Regions:
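Conserved alpha/beta-domain cores
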Residues: 1-48, 52-58, 64-65, 69, ...
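Active-site loop ensemble at the mouth of alpha/beta enzyme cores that anchors a bound cofactor
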Residues: 235
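Divalent-metal-activated hydrolytic enzyme cores
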Residues: 221-222
């Protein structure tokens, strides 16, 4: 699965990607992501209403009443998009994330898991989550240390409003393909160990623009690509 990382890009870029067939989008910052989710949801509603009005008018007569809100190839209907949160999670942003996103890739603390579970609204599907693992051992990088994912997975399994889907990693950048593959292979092995403990996992979120080939060779089910889709970031 291709996850289009839309951080820093405006809603218009997401519309264009949607028109080209993309449905899943990733955001790193809760506030920025929620603003886009809200804007695009309102736009989708406006276009659905306009589309319905146009269809009703066609039923009553042969006349077609043009409307700026009606969907077209250039103005897609914007059916529900799938939103993934992929950045570091601040405690004070857990409610925003739990209320607006369908996926979280960067869960690495029991406290955050509990807060997301508590904030997930009643009547909504469980929040899909991946545990982030620090496969490179970088001191400044988020993620649990390899071997600690099992404890967090057991905690998540007891939280009814979260659904553990798999593991995520953002390895330290390197051009050494052998090293890239070794780090991604480690994540796959950790996922297999969790499966042996009874966790039904189906997701390996790993690989970005510069290392996605190595990630795919090691079993990635979801790759995160931004600038290759949207162009260079300006901020």
């Amino acid at each position: 699965m291709l996850l289009a990382v839309s951080k820093t890009f405006p809603p218009g870029h997401i519309e264009a990607a949607y028109a080209a067939g993309q449905r899943a989008f990733g955001e790193n910052h809760a506030q920025e992501g929620v603003e886009k989710i809200t804007v695009l949801a309102a736009l989708a509603l406006e276009r659905r209403v306009a589309q319905g009005r146009q269809e009703n008018s066609r039923t009553r007569s042969d006349a077609i009443i043009p409307s700026a809100g009606v969907a077209s190839p250039e103005r897609p209907l914007l059916l529900p998009l799938e939103w993934h949160f992929i950045g570091p999670i601040q405690s004070n942003k857990t409610r925003l994330i739990a209320e607006h996103f369908q996926w979280v890739h960067s869960l690495d603390r029991e406290k955050i898991a509990q807060r997301l579970n508590a904030a997930r609204p009643d009547g909504t599907p469980p929040l899909n989550v991946c545990i982030q693992v620090n496969v490179s051992g970088e001191a400044a990088k988020s993620g649990v240390t390899p071997g600690e994912e099992a404890k967090l997975a057991d905690v998540i399994a007891r939280l009814p409003r979260l659904k553990l889907r798999g593991l995520m990693a953002i390895p330290e950048p390197t051009t050494d393909v052998t090293l890239q593959r070794r780090r991604f292979a480690l994540l796959r092995e950790l996922k297999d160990r969790l499966a042996a403990r009874g966790h039904a996992l189906d997701t390996l979120s790993m690989g970005m623009s510069d290392d996605l080939e190595a990630a795919i060779m090691e079993g990635a089910t979801m790759v995160r690509v931004g600038s290759a889709i949207f162009g260079p970031r300006t901020k």
